[in-house]
């Protein structure tokens, strides 16, 4: 049976709890430091509370420590990881191989390790190599197709595969984007991305002739694979990840609810093939609608091969749902909309004007299809498409208690008879069973706890079945809901005072909670001794799985640009040397003026030169080719294809000459290279 996990983002404790309540099987949250979203750090205490809450439902908490780590940060990083292990975190996401080396060598982590999407996994070979290093789960690049995902699954059939299914898309393969660091001194590999890909560019040819003027040529639509979850599961994916660790709580509620409902439908259709990774059913107080939550328009990206409409060239902002067209404008006061949608005071609307710019405004008053904005938009024209990017009524629904998650239980009660010399009942036995799902087929009912209450039972004057069931179903504010109360062996014929029934119910729930915690403790440790983690869990020893230079060249660019391996500390340098990489080049963030620390032969010598290393990090990176350029991005998105000029795929022949350049408003230019054999677009900085 295949387990399906919905993995949701948690900006903070509140968002994490909301994700669990709305159906997530796991959440991922930023560590106090060193996560790939520097603005999304959380305290250890908040993470501990989130673990306690999630574990009640068998849900998991993953913590991201997925940046590259400088040597002077290593001790703090390892100490934090050990603390995360102690508070019950279920999985750790890593990018830095130096951190991996120390975690394994010092036995600092007792549970799952996941390779971050920052590891840039595009091929079966790289996925397999990472599993030999100790990673139980591989997070794949967002750009992969179903066939590519299937090929990776076939290479690592006994390991978990995590795929992104919803949210913002990075235009470059994750982990190998250096544009933000180059242009603004803010490294994406350090969680400080400056959103270079959401900026305006001119597109110029080799003669400086303008092809496109001030458009968002690197800005992609948002990913949405809601209708392809089963396809992904059939390809081998087991975890479905929602992007958005900086998104607000209403975003989390709506998106998680939509995807959880879809996964439930898949499980219900084939209960003997699929099951959810956690327990509990959710009652929603709203109907999920992805169009009503922040989005730039949706795309399936490359799931079924290259598609023409993946970019959002007009705006990087949220557009929202289409609600109609402007029909008629009355001066500077109001306008009429041709629509079947209804509006509320305070709705946020927007449109793309004649200059292909997004304009937005707030509705002040509504009279049917006639809207009175706070200020009439200057560039609105009849016939323009209108979008709603803030639905006040929907947001109000989400602001209230919008869902409740409960675990179905089945309670069985029966009288306990005496021995053959004493036929009268000696008390009541109550047993509680947890249901994985409420469907009869594949419901996975299993016994959890039981209670015996010794008391003298007397026959009731009238049937007690309804009263006993009602009393035992009063589970109040607990996380449990009585799906069924079964009375066995004539239990309904005996009288039991309500006070006794209440006591039995409370004791039963207490025992259930204890049993769940005991089972949780066992599952968290996974049944292995932590000393086995380093050398007995099927992972290679340091240097055991050496690669040749050709094997280390995951893509052609890796053979030309050594900084793509993101080696930022002494441990990572030694790791790659032991595993056969040569030459070993420091991370882009360290710059080409290699500090003496980088050339150290021992860690002690390295540590002595840390201050020089710090000083070097303040300098501009200087890794360049013979043209004085640096490779900043590798993209499957292709501007030439999106504009209709890909001759390989039937596009028109361009009238301009290559190379093409993207140019920022301040004059900085970036050369585009179209690597058609790889079907990839690379972006280079100029001198």
Where on the chain are the PLM-derived regions?
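Surface-exposed amphipathic alpha-helical tracts and adjacent flexible/coil segments at the periphery
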Residues: 1-22, 26-36, 46, 50-51, ...
């Amino acid at each position: 049976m295949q387990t399906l996990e919905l993995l949701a983002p948690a900006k903070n404790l509140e968002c994490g709890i909301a994700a669990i309540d709305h159906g997530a099987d796991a959440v991922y949250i930023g560590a106090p430091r060193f996560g790939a979203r520097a603005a999304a750090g959380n305290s250890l205490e908040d993470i501990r509370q989130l673990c306690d809450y999630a574990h009640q439902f068998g849900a998991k908490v993953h913590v991201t420590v997925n940046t590259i780590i400088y040597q002077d940060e290593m001790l703090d990083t390892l100490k934090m990881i050990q603390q995360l292990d102690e508070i019950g975190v279920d999985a750790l996401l890593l990018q830095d191989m130096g951190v991996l080396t120390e975690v394994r060598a010092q036995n600092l982590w007792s549970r799952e390790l996941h390779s971050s999407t920052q590891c840039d996994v595009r091929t079966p070979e790289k996925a397999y190599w990472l599993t030999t290093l100790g990673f139980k789960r591989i997070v794949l690049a967002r750009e992969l197709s179903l066939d590519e995902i299937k090929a990776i699954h076939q290479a690592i059939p006994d390991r978990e595969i995590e795929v992104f299914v919803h949210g913002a898309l990075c235009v470059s393969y994750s982990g190998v984007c250096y544009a933000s660091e180059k242009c603004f001194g803010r490294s994406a590999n350090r969680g400080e991305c400056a959103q270079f890909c959401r900026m305006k560019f001119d597109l110029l040819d080799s003669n400086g002739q303008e092809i496109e003027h001030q458009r968002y040529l690197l800005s992609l639509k948002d990913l949405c694979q809601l209708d392809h979850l089963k396809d992904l599961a059939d390809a081998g994916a087991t975890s479905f990840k929602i992007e958005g660790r900086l998104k607000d709580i209403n975003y989390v509620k709506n998106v998680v609810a939509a995807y959880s409902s879809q996964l439930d439908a898949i499980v219900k259709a084939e209960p003997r093939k699929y099951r959810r990774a956690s327990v509990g059913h959710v009652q929603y107080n709203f109907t999920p609608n992805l169009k009503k939550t922040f989005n730039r328009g949706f795309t399936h990206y490359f799931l079924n091969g290259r598609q023409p409409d993946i970019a959002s060239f007009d705006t990087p902002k949220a557009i929202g749902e289409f609600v109609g067209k402007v029909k008629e404008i009355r001066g500077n006061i109001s306008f009429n909309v041709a629509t079947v949608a209804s509006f509320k005071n305070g709705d946020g609307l927007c449109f793309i004007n004649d200059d292909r710019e997004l304009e937005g405004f707030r509705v002040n008053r509504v009279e049917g299809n006639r809207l009175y904005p706070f200020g009439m938009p200057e560039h609105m024209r009849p016939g323009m498409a209108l979008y709603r990017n803030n639905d006040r009524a929907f947001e109000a629904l989400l602001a209230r208690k919008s869902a409740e998650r409960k675990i179905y239980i089945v309670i069985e009660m029966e009288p306990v008879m005496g021995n053959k010399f004493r036929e009268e009942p000696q008390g009541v036995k109550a047993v509680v069973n947890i249901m994985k799902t409420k469907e009869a087929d594949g419901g996975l009912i299993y016994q959890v706890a039981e209670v015996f209450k010794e008391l003298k039972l007397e026959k009731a004057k009238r049937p007690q079945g309804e009263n006993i069931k009602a009393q035992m179903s009063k589970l109040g504010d607990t996380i449990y809901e009585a799906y069924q109360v079964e009375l066995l062996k004539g239990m309904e014929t005996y009288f039991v005072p309500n006070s006794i029934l209440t006591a039995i119910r409370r004791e039963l729930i207490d025992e259930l909670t204890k049993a769940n915690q005991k089972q949780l403790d066992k599952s968290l440790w996974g049944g292995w001794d932590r000393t086995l983690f380093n050398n007995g869990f099927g992972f290679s020893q340091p240097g055991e799985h050496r690669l040749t230079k050709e094997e280390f060249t995951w893509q052609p660019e890796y053979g030309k640009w050594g900084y793509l391996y993101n080696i930022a500390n002494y441990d990572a340098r030694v790791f790659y040397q032991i595993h056969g990489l040569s030459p070993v080049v420091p991370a882009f963030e360290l710059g080409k003026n290699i500090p003496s620390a980088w050339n150290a032969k021992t860690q002690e010598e390295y540590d002595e030169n840390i201050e020089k290393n710090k000083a070097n990090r303040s300098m501009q990176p200087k890794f360049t080719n013979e043209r004085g350029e640096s490779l900043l991005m590798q993209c499957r998105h292709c501007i030439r294809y999106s504009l209709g000029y890909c001759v390989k795929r039937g596009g028109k022949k361009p009238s301009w000459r290559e190379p093409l350049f993207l140019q920022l408003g301040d004059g900085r230019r970036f050369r585009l290279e179209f690597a058609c054999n790889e079907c990839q677009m690379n972006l280079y900085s100029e001198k």
